[in-house]
Amino acid sequence: MIVGAVAVLLIAWGCDSEPAPSAEVVAAGDIASCRTEGDEATAELVEGIDGTVLALGDEAYPQGTTANFEECYGPSWGRFKGRTKPVPGNHEYYTEGARDYFEYFGEVAGDPGEGYYSYELGSWHVVALNSNCEEVRCGPGSPQTKWLNEDLAANDETRCTLAYMHHPRFSSGEKHGSTGGGVEKLWEVLYEADTDVVFSGHEHNYERFSPQDPQGRADPEGASASS
C-alpha cells in the first residue's frame, strides 16, 4: 500500500527556542498489506534511519485486525514498534472502536476511545490527533478539540509545533481529496496556535504545500502541510 516514507530532520527554524538537539523522524501512512511488498521495501530504508517513526494511520490493511497487524505490519514496519508514535486511520476502525489497533500499540497510542496525545521531541512539541471524526468527535466543544486547545495553550511558545493525523485537510489526489468538517476544525485550532507543520496520510501519494490557513489561503504564518 505504501508509496513512500518521508524522513525529516526537525530543526527549530524560525522558532524562538534556545539551541536544542535536533530530532529525526520518519513519517508514513497507509503502510502494510500482505498482498503487496511495498512495506517491506520502505522498511529496509527505515532500517538505516534513526529517530521516531510517525505512523500516519491505516497501518495494517485491510481491516486493522490483530491478524493484519501481526502477519502484515509486524514483519516489516513492526520492527520499529519500539520507536513508533501512531495515529489511527479509517481502516483501523473497520474493527469496532479500533480495538485491535489500541491493543497492538498499547499505551503509546493514547487512551482507547480517544487516540490523541502529545509529547516533546528535541525542541519540538508534537501533537498526534485522531481525524476519524465520525468515531471521535472533532468539532467545537468536543473532548478532542477541548484537549487540543488546552494542550497547545500549555505548550512553551519557544517550541515549534508539529501535528499529524490520518486525513489530510488539503490534497490534490483524486481518490479522497481534501477533508473538511471536523478536520478543518482541528486545523483552525492548530492555526490559531501557530502550528508549523502538519503531516497526514490517506491519499496514497506524496505532496507538500506552502504555508496556508485552514481555508487554503496562502499565509506565511500558516502551517506547512505534507501528505
Regions found by a protein language model. Name each.
Residues 2-12:
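Bacterial N-terminal signal peptides
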Residues 13, 169-170, 205:
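Intrinsic structural disorder/low-complexity segments
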Residues 47, 61-161, 174-197, 204-227:
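Extended active-site neighborhood of metal-dependent phosphoesterases/phosphodiesterases
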Residues 25-27, 53-55, 86-87, 163, ...:
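Residue-level marker for buried hydrophobic side chains located in beta-strands
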